[in-house]
Amino acid sequence: LVLAELPAVGRTERTAERVVCPVCGNVARFCKLSKCPYYRGVYEAISRSLSSGSLFGPSPPAVLFGEWGYPKVYGGACLSFLEGVNAWLLESPSRWLTLSIDDLLSLRLALFFGRLRFPVVSARRPGKVLEAIQESALSSLPVDVEMKIVGSVKARPGFGVRASPHGPSARVEDLRVVGNVSAPRRVEQLVSDVDVSASEAVAELHARGVDEYYLARVFSAGLLGRRADRRLVPTEWSITAIDDMLGRMLLRRVRDLRVIDEYRVFEASALFNSVFVVLVPSVWMFELLEGWLRFLDESPYADYEFYWGRSSYAESTGGAYYAVRLSVLRYLASRGVQAGAIVFFEVDRGWIPLGVWRFRELTRAALESGGRRFDSLDEALSYVGSRLRIPLSKYLSRSRLVPFIRSQSRLA
């Protein structure tokens, strides 16, 4: 993908924006203080904390950059102002599947977002505030952040399509990191090297075990790449860009591996989401089929690719496509095998938008579950159909890979 393609929002992501919160019955991104027990408590706490006009607290770390007004965007850092909060857990999606939505809301809405507007090219020569934001983004451990607030606090929480939500926000006139920042040495070296491309830096850091969440954060903060190419990248774009970069890297490896010799089904459920991964004995091909129980009158969303991958953005499933594909490719590469993959993702009525991470982490959890083996595609799909709540026929009516695989079987 190129950044110019990333502002596009998938059709399923537009569906997510209509999701009604089960707590208050309103659209999640239009939360009301009068009804939300989580947010009301958070807002009351921050109102007391802001009596001095400044805030001090630990950041997981977390930085955010919006896309509105691009190429001049709002960006900043987040800190937690509630006592007893595990700052590290606030930005650790790999640990969130075991939490309830109530717990996740309580965690994420306790993050205060201090923001300022920046031209995206200012990443190349940052001023004092942006430099502090970039410094916090580099840290691999929680850091203490101090903000001086100007103007009123925006009471409405921030629910995004791909990024995890945050609590109240306000404009800051000053922001600084208190104490030392802990960053991997090689990351610091690549940040200082303005002759290495972002894709080269991402590839090397991923090979060294740096995860996609850290990579998306430093990429969003404009800390990777050649000097002339560095810019602030809206957080939701950076998440998908990193998922796509890593997926393409892994795909180049997977295409050279041996093909599996059986049909396998993996499954997992958490947080009102269920995933079923069907691996088939074929060269690489991939399809994501996503259905919403809240919108049964609408057809499932679908995107796919064949052996050489995609050359255009996945317009139906959006960022979810790249998140799920990354987890599947990572699994195949780690096992030294190649396969085709058809992934069914079902979203229950209780879900509210908490970010694209759940596609990545739930797929990863499913693939680590052991799975079941079947003798044919029809047997595998029959099992998946018995576990889905939306009729299998609705998913298959949108699938391109299932009829293709069946036609190849008949030819063989």
Where are these regions (language model features)?
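Long, low-complexity intrinsically disordered regions enriched in acidic and polar residues
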Residues: 1-412
